[in-house]
Regions:
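Helix-loop-helix "hinge/cap" segment bordering the ligand-binding cleft or interdomain interface
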Residues: 1-57, 78-124, 191-204, 210-222, ...
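Second-shell loop/turn segments in exported
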Residues: 5-14, 86-90, 335-344, 359-369
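Short, solvent-exposed loop/turn segments at the edges of secondary structure
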Residues: 182-188
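Conserved small-residue motifs centered on glycine
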Residues: 211, 215-360
C-alpha cells in the first residue's frame, strides 16, 4: 500500500524489479527539461563513477534472474561455485551473454551514459553528473552503483539518496540481494623475497608491514599524519566506538578538492590508505558520511536485503554454493602461473573490451570496421574457447 507512486522505489516499502527500474529510466530520459527546470536537455539515467568502473554495469546481472558477474567487490573476482561445488568462470556463461545483450538494449535507448565505456576518458562522471547542479553549464545523471559515504557527501550533491536494490529472482528465490561483498585481497599481504636484493632490505620490508599493525602505524595508514587530527579529541561513531577525529581543515579541504570523497582525498592528496596489507578502520568513513548516508545505511540494515558474506549463507535455492564469495586473487604456484601464461590468453585486458563492444554495438548494429560482434551465445563462447578457457579454468580449479 503506497501513499504515492515514488514509494515503489524509495524508502523501506520499495519493491520494484529490473523491468520497473528500466521503465523509470525511460521516464527520466524522456523528461529532461521538466526534471531540470529547463537547465538541461539531457539527463543520463545510469552511469558509472568513471570509465575504469564500467564493469559495475555488469552488477545489474544480479537483477536479471541472479546471473553471477563477480563473487566479491573486485572486478577480477570473475568466478562462482556451481551446485556441484566446482569453480566456474562467470564471464563465459550464457547468462552473462544475455546480460550484455540486455545492457546493449539499454545503451541503444540512451539509458546508459555514453562515455562510460571509453577507458581513455579519465573524467570522474559522478562529479560531473551529480556535482555540477549549480554551475553555469550543469550536467545531470540519475542513478549509479557506488559506495554510500562518498556518493552522498553534501559537498557533492545534497539531493542524493540511497535506495533498496531491485527485487529479483536470485538463486531461484525472489529477494533483495546485493552481490558485492568486500573481499580480503591477499595480494597486499605478502612480501616477495625476489624483490629484496639483500636480507637487510627484506627485514626493512617486514618491519614496514609490522609497523602498520601497531597503534601508531594503523592510525597513520587510516587517518594520516598527526597534524591532520585534533589533539585530545575523538569522534564517536554510530557503533559507539571512539575514533581519531579529523581537523576542520581536513574536512573543508576534502570538500573543496575532492567533492567530499574523503577516501580519495586521503589516498591522492595526503598519502595514506596505501594499498599495503593493513587493518582498515571504518572511523574515517563515518566522519564524512552525511545524514543521508547514515539514513541509507539504516534503510539497508533494517530491510530484508541480503548481502554476500564470508559465511556464504543466504536463502536456500537452486545452488547451495551461490552465496559463497570467491577471492579476486589466488595464490597460484609457479607451475600454475606458467601454465596459464603459456597456454591461454584469458588474462588479456582486451577480453572485457570485447564484452563491452557487445554492449555498445550489438543492439545498434553499428560496430566500426574491424570490430566483430558475436551473433549468438555460441559465437560468444567460441571467443573464450579460442583463448583456451578450459585450461584457464582448470588451473584455477
Amino acid at each position: 500500500d503506497y501513499e504515492k507512486p515514488s514509494e515503489l522505489f524509495l524508502g523501506e516499502k520499495a519493491a520494484y524489479d529490473i523491468d520497473e527500474l528500466i521503465a523509470l529510466m525511460r521516464c527520466i530520459k524522456a523528461n529532461p527539461t521538466y526534471l531540470t527546470q529547463g537547465k538541461a536537455d539531457t539527463v543520463w539515467p545510469m552511469f558509472t563513477r568513471q570509465s575504469s568502473y564500467r564493469e559495475d554495469l555488469l552488477r545489474l546481472s544480479t537483477y536479471f534472474d541472479g546471473v553471477k558477474a563477480h563473487s566479491a567487490d573486485s572486478y577480477t573476482s570473475r568466478w562462482y561455485i556451481d551446485e556441484t561445488g566446482t569453480l566456474q568462470y562467470t564471464y563465459s556463461t550464457e547468462g552473462m551473454y544475455d546480460v550484455l545483450c540486455y545492457l546493449s538494449d539499454m545503451e541503444a535507448e540512451g539509458l546508459i551514459y555514453s562515455d562510460c565505456y571509453d577507458l581513455t576518458n579519465k573524467t570522474n562522471f559522478r562529479s560531473t553528473l551529480w556535482g555540477t547542479d549549480e554551475s553555469e553549464a550543469p550536467a545531470y545523471g540519475f542513478i549509479t552503483f557506488d559506495w554510500q559515504a562518498s556518493s552522498t557527501a553534501d559537498s557533492l550533491n545534497k539531493d542524493i539518496v540511497v535506495v533498496l536494490p531491485p527485487v529479483a529472482k536470485v538463486n531461484g528465490v525472489w529477494q533483495y540481494y546485493i552481490d558485492n561483498g568486500r573481499a580480503i585481497k591477499p595480494d597486499g599481504w605478502s612480501i616477495s623475497v625476489a624483490g629484496c636484493a639483500t636480507d637487510a632490505e627484506l627485514y626493512r620490508s617486514c618491519a614496514l608491514l609490522d609497523y602498520f599493525f601497531t597503534e601508531e602505524g594503523s592510525t597513520l595508514q587510516n587517518y594520516g599524519l598527526p597534524m591532520f587530527l585534533k589533539e585530545n579529541e575523538t569522534y564517536t561513531g554510530p557503533d559507539g566506538k571512539e575514533y581519531p577525529q579529523y581537523t576542520d581543515w581536513v574536512m573543508e579541504t576534502c570538500a573543496s578538492v575532492a567533492k567530499g570523497d574523503l577516501s580519495t582525498f586521503l589516498r591522492d592528496w595526503l598519502g595514506c590508505l596505501i594499498p599495503i596489507g593493513y587493518q582498515k578502520d571504518i572511523g574515517f568513513e563515518y566522519q564524512y558520511t552525511s545524514e543521508r548516508g547514515f539514513e541509507g545505511w539504516e534503510l539497508l540494515q533494517n530491510s530484508t536485503t541480503h548481502f554476500a558474506t564470508y559465511a556464504g549463507e543466504g536463502i536456500k535455492g537452486d545452488n547451495p554454493n551461490y552465496y559463497k564469495m570467491v577471492p579476486p586473487v589466488f595464490s597460484l604456484t609457479l607451475r600454475q602461473k606458467e601454465a596459464i601464461s603459456e597456454t591461454t590468453t584469458m588474462g588479456m585486458e582486451d577480453l572485457s573490451e570485447e564484452m563491452f563492444n557487445i554492449v555498445r554495438y550489438n543492439a545498434k548494429g553499428n560496430a566500426p570496421n574491424g570490430i566483430s560482434i558475436p551473433a549468438d551465445y555460441n559465437e560468444y563462447l567460441a571467443a573464450f574457447e579460442a583463448r583456451n578457457l578450459d585450461a584457464y579454468v582448470t588451473a584455477y580449479q
